[in-house]
Every structure is written in structure tokens, then in C-alpha cells.
């Protein structure tokens, strides 16, 4: 079995590179067809109300993501102030979106900041694990519903057909059902993974995870939908976002640069919206959801680092009570 590991790692690298090359080719093909003058015209003429609404949804999305770590606070029972938890979550999420691949840098950022604030490594691991689980539970639930009901219309030349996507949707919903069943009825609620003790949450806690994460994914989809001028069905846009997110995980490109654009251009090709509108919406989305929060996160990170010793002492006194 051990001998197969190097081959499997090599196969994964080859498949990842093939997928990456396919995305690049797809992006180049569509980029050559785009009327870039139309793109800049759309950006210049953006409706102010739509932009302000999109900004509001960005704030809502980041607050919802911060709730993942508040759930972690409840789950672990640590006593860090809620505002500190939200600030750490914001900084790590903004860094992760733009600078990392598949959460690697986010985990390092969380360990750095939470440990500076006085939390032990075992607690930080549980917080990070719960955050990742919460994020993907919302994805799995929404993806299961959207893929099962065939809301996403795949082009004829796509890598999988709609039947396969429906089967995937059913599998995702089964995963949700199994998770809820274990949370509600499992007698053995403690498990150890890589030396870390994990406890199954209650079914009510699991429902809270799904509700918060689903709301976050829906807010992200609504941002793009608003920036596209609401010309495409909202749930179709959300479904395309879900497809592009999993494609970004496969390719391992920081911020999913190029992947998001390639998937949206491919899947929205048959809709009544121009490629210029799609590109303009995604550029605006990247500025609002990635770039501006990253700048704010850098400032917040410096503030946290400068005040870490004072905050740690205060937190240790609170945890000692």
C-alpha cells in the first residue's frame, strides 16, 4: 500500500496540471472573444445602487464568515472576546482568499494570531477544523439542492453532463443527511484524528453551521448577481459560483485567478448577457470581495500584532477565572 502513495501523488500532480492547462486554454479562448471596450463601458456605467448593495453584501458575507469562529468559540468553550475572534477571522479569511491555496496559509495565520492571543494549539486546531467543516457544509447543502434540481445548465462540450451533476447533487444531500444523523443519534461522540480529540456537535449546532454557511455562500452569489445587473437567474449564478469554487480547489491557484472567470464565461455563454458584462462583474467582484478587504486586513493584522502582548495578558487573566 505504501508503494502506491508516490504514484498516487504523481497522478494527482499530473491531473492538477492538466486541469490547470485546460483552464488556461479555456480562458485564453474566451479572452480573445471578449470585447474589452464593452467591459470598461459596463464598469464605468455601473448603477450606484447596485454597487452599494454589493458592498453591503460583502460586509454581510465577512460577518457571516466571522460567525464560523464564533461557533468555534462556543464549540471549544474558550473565553477570547467576541470582537477579537471576529477580527482574527476577518484577517485570516481575507488573507486566505487572496494569498493561499486550499486554506494552508489561513491555518498558519490562525495559529499565529490565536496563539499570540493566548489560545493553546489544540484549541486552535479545533477552531480551524470546525471553520472548514462549517464552510463546506453550506457548500454541500446548496450544491446538493442546486445540482439535484438541474438549475445549472452545462454546455454540450463541458467535462461532465447534467445527469452526472444531478447524481453528484444527490450524493451531496446524502452527505448532509448522514452528518445530521450522526450529530443527532450517534452514541460515540468522541473521536481522535491525528492526535486531536474531536467531539460531534448537537444536531441544533449542525443546523446552525449549515444555516450560517449557506447564507454566506448565498451572499457571495448575490454580489456577483447584482454586479451582472440581475440579467441572469440568481440561483443559476449561485450554482456557477459553486462549480467555479470546486474547480479553484482542484487547480490550487491563489484567489482562483482565471478559474472563476473561465467557468463563468463557459457556463453563462448561452445566457442573455454579454461577455463584457460577465468580465466587468467579476473584476468588480474581485476588487470588492478580495482586494479592498485584503488592504483592511493588513491594517488589522498590524494592529493585532502591535497589541498582542497586552491582549494576551488580559485574555489569560480572563481564562484563569
Language-model region placement:
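Predominantly cytoplasmic-facing regulatory/coupling regions of multi-pass membrane proteins
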Residues: 1-90, 148-249, 275, 280-282, ...
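Hydrophobic alpha-helical segments and helix pairs
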Residues: 116, 120-157, 163
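Membrane-embedded alpha-helical segments of transport systems
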Residues: 95, 99, 124-144, 247, ...
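Interfacial segments of multi-pass membrane proteins
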Residues: 113-123, 240, 244, 262-278
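Transmembrane alpha-helix interface/packing and boundary motifs in multi-pass membrane proteins
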Residues: 91-100, 242-261
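Membrane-interface alpha-helices at helix entry/exit sites of multi-pass transporters
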Residues: 83-87, 102-106, 116-133, 273-284
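Re-entrant/interfacial helical elements at transmembrane boundaries that shape
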Residues: 104-116, 145, 254-269, 283
Amino acid at each position: 500500500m505504501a508503494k502506491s502513495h508516490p504514484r498516487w501523488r504523481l497522478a494527482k500532480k499530473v491531473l492538477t496540471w492538466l486541469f490547470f492547462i485546460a483552464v488556461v486554454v479555456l480562458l485564453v479562448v474566451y479572452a480573445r472573444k471578449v470585447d474589452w471596450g464593452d467591459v470598461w463601458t459596463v464598469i464605468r456605467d455601473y448603477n450606484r445602487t447596485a454597487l452599494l448593495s454589493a458592498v453591503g453584501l460583502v460586509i454581510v458575507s465577512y460577518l457571516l464568515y466571522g460567525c464560523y469562529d464564533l461557533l468555534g468559540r462556543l464549540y471549544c468553550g474558550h473565553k477570547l472576546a467576541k470582537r477579537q475572534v471576529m477580527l482574527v477571522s476577518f484577517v485570516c479569511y481575507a488573507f486566505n482568499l487572496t494569498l493561499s491555496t486550499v486554506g494552508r496559509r489561513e491555518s498558519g495565520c490562525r495559529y499565529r494570531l490565536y496563539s499570540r492571543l493566548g489560545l493553546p494549539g489544540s484549541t486552535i486546531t479545533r477552531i480551524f477544523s470546525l471553520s472548514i467543516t462549517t464552510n463546506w457544509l453550506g457548500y454541500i447543502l446548496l450544491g446538493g439542492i442546486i445540482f439535484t434540481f438541474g438549475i445549472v445548465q452545462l454546455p454540450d462540450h463541458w467535462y461532465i453532463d447534467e445527469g452526472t451533476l444531478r447524481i453528484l447533487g444527490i450524493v451531496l444531500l446524502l452527505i448532509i443527511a448522514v452528518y445530521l444523523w450522526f450529530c443527532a443519534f450517534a452514541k460515540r461522540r468522541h473521536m481522535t484524528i491525528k492526535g486531536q480529540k474531536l467531539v460531534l456537535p448537537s444536531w441544533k449546532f449542525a443546523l446552525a453551521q449549515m444555516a450560517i454557511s449557506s447564507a454566506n455562500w448565498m451572499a457571495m452569489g448575490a454580489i456577483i448577481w447584482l454586479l451582472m445587473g440581475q440579467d441572469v437567474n440568481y440561483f443559476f449564478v449561485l450554482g456557477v459560483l459553486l462549480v467555479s469554487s470546486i474547480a479553484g480547489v482542484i487547480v490550487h491557484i491563489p484567489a482562483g485567478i482565471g478559474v472563476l472567470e473561465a467557468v463563468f464565461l463557459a457556463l453563462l455563454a448561452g445566457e442573455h448577457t454579454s461577455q463584457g458584462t460577465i468580465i466587468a462583474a467579476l473584476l468588480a467582484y474581485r476588487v470588492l470581495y478580495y482586494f479592498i478587504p485584503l488592504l483592511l486586513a493588513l491594517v488589522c493584522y498590524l494592529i493585532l500584532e502591535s497589541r498582542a502582548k497586552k491582549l494576551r495578558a488580559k485574555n489569560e487573566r480572563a481564562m484563569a477565572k
